[in-house]
Curated annotation (Swiss-Prot):
Cofactor(s) this protein requires: Mg(2+)
Annotated organism of origin: Pseudomonas fluorescens (strain Pf0-1)
Gene Ontology BP, a term: thiamine diphosphate biosynthetic process
Residues annotated as binding 2-[(2R,5Z)-2-carboxy-4-methylthiazol-5(2H)-ylidene]ethyl phosphate: 132-134, 162
Name of this protein: Thiamine-phosphate synthase
Length: 207
């Protein structure tokens, strides 16, 4: 499966009161991967929202990814994104099967990406590249890291962290396949603006 394009990530606080309408607006503009990210302990609501997103993604032929919850991903038969505190990737690959999309957070360390690749990751994510509202304390990445990753890794590379339409072009120029965006996509005043931004990100990536 070729993974290239916009990687939209939800934020429950940012999308409060407009969750599904803004997500559908993004899908209308074109989303390669949609990550459901919710750190709350309300499992019933998380299941309800994830099921709604799965149905939307099926309609728009977009792949749904669950953040940090392999069991929920298995229940819905979708992909998962794992952080460095979530343990080794191999058991998750065994749980979800060889076709599932599994991503791995690698911060600013190429070694973590190489390990994730060996364990069966579908893509690796580096970041943050810019100041991030979602993870303000995350270590920062350089464009040089992207160059090195492109030379040594043979799987899609995702960039995350404070990405907007104004700063994304250099990341694409240095070989990024997936632009993971939260506020730069969903921090809009209308659904029409969300759709416009999604299309503009895809134009940058020539998708």
């Amino acid at each position: 499966m070729k993974l290239r394009g916009l990687y939209a990530i939800t934020d429950s606080q940012l999308l409060a009161g407009k969750f599904l309408s803004y997500v559908e607006a993004a899908l209308e503009g074109g989303v390669t991967l949609l990550q459901y990210r919710d750190k709350s302990s309300d499992e019933a609501r998380r299941l309800r929202e994830a099921e709604a997103l799965r149905d939307l993604c099926e309609r728009y032929k977009t792949q749904l990814i669950i953040n940090d919850d392999a069991e929920l991903a298995a229940r819905l038969n979708v992909g998962v994104h794992l952080g460095q505190t979530d343990g080794p990737l191999s058991p998750t690959r065994a749980l979800l099967g060889y076709k599932a999309i599994i991503g791995s957070t690698c911060h600013a360390q190429l070694e973590l990406a190489e390990q994730a690749a060996r364990e069966g990751a579908s893509y690796v994510a580096f970041g943050r590249f810019f100041n991030s509202n979602t993870k303000p304390g995350a270590p920062s990445c350089s464009l040089d890291l992207l160059d090195e990753a492109k030379r040594t890794l043979h799987l899609p590379i995702c960039a995350i962290g404070g990405i907007t339409l104004d700063n994304a072009a250099p990341l694409v120029a240095h070989g990024v396949d997936l632009l993971a965006v939260v506020h730069g996509l969903f921090g809009a005043n209308s659904t029409a603006e969300v759709t416009r931004r999604a299309r503009a990100f895809n134009e940058l990536l020539k998708v």
